[in-house]
């Protein structure tokens, strides 16, 4: 279970403050206007930002000040951060060992994830030889191979065409269910959120302004839709 209690980030001396509980295996969408604090929330969970106050626990363990490399969290961005001089296999392998010294079990795990992502025939290629969708599959494979209990997505598929974006969202949702991972996904699209998340959190002005069923946001009725700017 992920629990944030009054986690506070000072943005130009204006506090963003979040309290949130997410159960293990839950898939949650984080919605809200641009600049509301959605990415800040994910970066606080991942450890890329250090809170001024508050606490963050994962499965009852305090990770408020744990550095990103030691948190039980993986994060995927719109910019996939693949290393252009490394092959697909090497980029995925970094998720298992930064020195790329993989034992037989790790090699098998890497290839199993590649097969799951549908990129097992691309392992010898460089990122520059891949399409945008293929590069995001590689980046996702690198996240999943780490087998961390929490996966954070900061709009990684927003640049893809609608059909490919839906395919990637389905792949993420299925993978998280298989590995019993908790998923938090930032999105500007309520429709994308509804595809994989039954629960949504709406962020506004650096606060969690609403949380509940995604279908309520999609319906265009109620307070969540008003914050989000949807009218039914």
From Swiss-Prot:
Disulfide bonds: none annotated. PANTHER family: SPERMIDINE/PUTRESCINE IMPORT ATP-BINDING PROTEIN POTA, THIAMINE IMPORT ATP-BINDING PROTEIN THIQ. It catalyses: thiamine(out) + ATP + H2O = thiamine(in) + ADP + phosphate + H(+). Its EC number is 7.6.2.15. It is found in: Cell inner membrane. Part of the ABC transporter complex ThiBPQ involved in thiamine import. Responsible for energy coupling to the transport system. Pfam families: ABC_tran. It comes from Shigella flexneri. The keyword RNA-binding does not apply. Keywords: ATP-binding, Cell inner membrane, Cell membrane, Membrane, Nucleotide-binding, Translocase, Transport. Belongs to the ABC transporter superfamily. Thiamine importer (TC 3.A.1.19.1) family. Residues 2-230 form the ABC transporter domain. InterPro entries: AAA+_ATPase, ABC_SmlMolc_Importer, ABC_transporter-like_ATP-bd, ABC_transporter-like_CS, P-loop_NTPase, Thiamine_ABC_ThiQ. This is Thiamine import ATP-binding protein ThiQ.
């Amino acid at each position: 279970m992920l629990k944030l209690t009054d986690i506070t980030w000072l943005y130009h001396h204006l506090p963003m403050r979040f309290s949130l509980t997410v159960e293990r295996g839950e898939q949650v969408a984080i919605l809200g206007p641009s600049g509301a604090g959605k990415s800040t929330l994910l970066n606080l969970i991942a450890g890329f930002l250090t809170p001024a106050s508050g606490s963050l626990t994962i499965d009852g363990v305090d990770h408020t000040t744990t550095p990103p490399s030691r948190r039980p969290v993986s994060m995927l961005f719109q910019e996939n951060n693949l290393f252009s001089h490394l092959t697909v296999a090497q980029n995925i392998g970094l998720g298992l060992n930064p020195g790329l010294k993989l034992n037989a079990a790790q090699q098998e795990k890497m290839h199993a994830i590649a097969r799951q992502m549908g990129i097992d025939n691309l392992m010898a290629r460089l990122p520059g030889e891949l399409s945008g969708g293929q590069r995001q599959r590689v980046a996702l494979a690198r996240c999943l191979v780490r087998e961390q209990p929490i996966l954070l997505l900061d709009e990684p598929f927003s640049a893809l065409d609608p059909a490919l974006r839906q395919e990637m969202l389905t792949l993420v949702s299925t993978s998280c269910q298989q590995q019993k991972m908790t998923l938090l996904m930032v999105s500007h699209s309520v429709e994308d959120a509804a595809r994989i998340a039954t629960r949504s959190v709406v962020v506004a002005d650096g606060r969690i302004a609403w949380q509940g069923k995604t279908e309520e946001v999609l319906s265009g009725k109620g307070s969540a839709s008003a914050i989000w700017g949807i009218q039914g």
